[in-house]
């Protein structure tokens, strides 16, 4: 068989059209680099975040949040009843159509931004073809590629080969289900959540991480009978215990999610009564629901011929990189979810831009440019929201020693709930500031309560700059707000 011949050589080949890949491609092109971006999902530029992640999830969260607020109206004299949203009140299918149309508009915006920056892009599966790093692309749909040949339509499954001086692997990840569970295929993943054509009357969500917490909160707020199956006693076990306990208790005691603790996970799934599912748990408990959602994590998309170019993986089967995003191959780089460091959209964007600054700007000021992965803020769009930056209380004690740590905590009902006599309507506000050393440097901040995502952004800047508790105290509070508690704690 004759060796493959590249039809065009680029300065930069970017494999993956998610947030990190697009950001790096555009930044490289802004410096004059000749860039080709390859995205496997046909006409779905933007990656997980735009298509099956943070963007459509946040739209669904807004719907759930409004549903929760509906039964607050009576307390403010705007309704004569305080009925909660019931199954059937929410027009799932119409809302899905609107949400999907919004995502489609974003796909188009991503494409236009690439064109405006002079980035060539193609829809197809990329695979390293040889040890030189040439990339073979199998097209995933019929498409015009005017940068190759004006007016010609290239056909689905056609193969094209490209060469690049530098290559970026930004392939992201995919949602998993447990293959060893009998009947696992009867459930869907968090990706499949966005494909549901109708709202399930009852649903089981399996997994205690932020995706499971967010989706179960949305389902319950919109009126579905909701079961959250977890192996331990709390949700969000990778977060500070204050967040774990606050969200677990609120979901159980007030929101009405049936959290099944110490479940032993799922041992078997069977189909019953049409499309309903019978779920047998490891602890012997049995659930019968309309829908099963697996939220048990994601794996890196690595099946692209990495062995041919000497790119190595870590023990979690994620692409191994150094602090400069460089793989074991000096001409191949990687970032985003596929490396598994901090799997957040803004992190991938920041890493991608810094990488292109270093590789293509020609500016010595950027020759050591790389992303600092510490003190990255993250939020959970639960009901209520939660946010975190820095070290948990446990992590801080392990790093600095227990005698060097001081904790400031506050738990209260936000002023918004003052008009409500029924305690079941009130969601908690819980704040924790973790400080280390004699100067009480703030090394962790963990908050639960309404608007936590918006509140955390500004405090994230302060903590990234090395703020101390004294700095917090010296800030004049904005009154009346919940956030003022963070600068008035004693």
Swiss-Prot record:
Residues annotated for FAD binding in this entry: 19-20, 39, 48-49, 57, 126, 337, 345, 479
Cofactor(s) demanded: FAD
Keywords: Cytoplasm, Disulfide bond, FAD, Flavoprotein, Mitochondrion, NADP, Oxidoreductase, Redox-active center
GO biological process: cell redox homeostasis; cellular response to oxidative stress; glutathione metabolic process
Record note on quaternary structure: Homodimer.
Leftover remarks: The active site is a redox-active disulfide bond.
Known function: Catalyzes the reduction of glutathione disulfide (GSSG) to reduced glutathione (GSH). Constitutes the major mechanism to maintain a high GSH:GSSG ratio in the cytosol.
Assigned protein family: Belongs to the class-I pyridine nucleotide-disulfide oxidoreductase family.
Protein name: Glutathione reductase
Originating organism: Debaryomyces hansenii (strain ATCC 36239 / CBS 767 / BCRC 21394 / JCM 1990 / NBRC 0083 / IGC 2968) (Yeast)
Taxonomic lineage of the native organism: Eukaryota, Fungi, Dikarya, Ascomycota, Saccharomycotina
Gene (name only): GLR1
